[in-house]
Amino acid sequence: MLVIAWLLGRFSTLAISDVERPSRHGALDGLRGLCATAVFIHHSAMAFTLYSSGKWRPLAGLGGLEGNFMGNLGSMGVMLFFMITGFLFIDRMIVKKGIEDWGQFYRKRLLRIAPLYLFVVSVVALVCLAYGLPSGPLEFLKQYIPWLGFGFFRLPDIGGYSSSWTVVCGVLWTLAIEWKFYFVLPVIGVLCISRGGAGSAVAASVVATVALSYSGSIEGKSAVIVLCFAVGGLAAYVFETKWRDILNKWPCGIVASVGLFAAVSYSFTSYNYLSLTAVGFFFLCVASGNSFFGSLSFKPLKVLGLISYSIYLCHGLALLAASKMTDDGLYVYGLTAAALLVPGCLLTYLYIERPFISGMRSAQPPMSAQLKSQ
């Protein structure tokens, strides 16, 4: 994927200009690319098994460290995506002392998320209809409309395609989680600008979540997901303190890298507190500006970060297409899917995502001006 991104990036001046845009948190661009790649690799193994044996699960032959690693890559990527979201928006609360116009905020979020989402679910519907038509228009609408709900509703099968959710690798539930976070942001904003500040808000959310988890009010996975956003908030708080200058140094980078690899390789379950601790410390380092010896500044990885939303929503379609093109084993299958995915996602970014992003940016001062004012 990195090689393909590098080749395509050289021929797309628009993509390169976006990658090179000044950023307050440049290392996060590369991290997004890493997360998208991790989710893709994880689902490649799952989809390969699905299209070869009919079961959505990791390769049956994988076990031990290799099996754990492949099995946990996806959850690691998703946890980091949640942390990035928590960090960016709580950092905004800290820097700008809240959000002045919540109506405008939600409109921008909708314009950022909805266009590509609606395009992808429409393509999914067309693919599923190719396998068989529903009994009539009303039946089709009954099947299709829940897919427009950003993951809030159970996804019924469309047309003749059994387990239609596998066409998107079941990722839509995470969008519902993100929207729930957006809905509680006004409360978080009040806490962030209160006397206690962001640190108190993060501490209160952690204590409340852990207490609810141990009382059985929320399940372990849900608690870990909530804490991912809290880790993002903690990183935003740390970014404004002297700890930032410690976490962005190479010794912390080495400790974080080893801890992350150990947690992903030795953990038998996803979304657990061990993984949260390791992934959380890794993220604290990245958010503090640690590029991990420049790896997160690698331009192809930043290109993948630029198109990470497209990769996240579209990789299931690429995996389905690749299953029709090759049966030469997992690695050839994965490479085939990547060769389809990255160019396709660059196109969806340029022609679906970017126009709406550019429209939102036109209403804001240039980033260079924002950086000078901080």
Task: Walk through the language-model features, giving the residues of each.
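Hydrophobic transmembrane alpha-helical segments in integral membrane proteins
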Residues: 1-2
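Juxtamembrane transmembrane-helix termini
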Residues: 5-18, 77-111, 119-136, 318, ...
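Alpha-helical transmembrane segments in multi-pass integral membrane proteins
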Residues: 11-30, 37, 41-70, 91-99, ...
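Residues within membrane-spanning alpha-helices of integral membrane proteins
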Residues: 29, 33-36, 78, 85, ...
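Hydrophobic alpha-helical transmembrane segments of multipass integral membrane proteins
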Residues: 38, 74, 81-82, 89, ...
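Membrane-interface helix-loop-helix regions
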Residues: 56-76, 103, 114-179, 277-286
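Alpha-helical transmembrane segments and their helix-entry boundary regions
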Residues: 101-105, 113, 174, 182, ...
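Hydrophobic alpha-helical transmembrane segments of integral membrane proteins
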Residues: 111-127, 205-217, 225
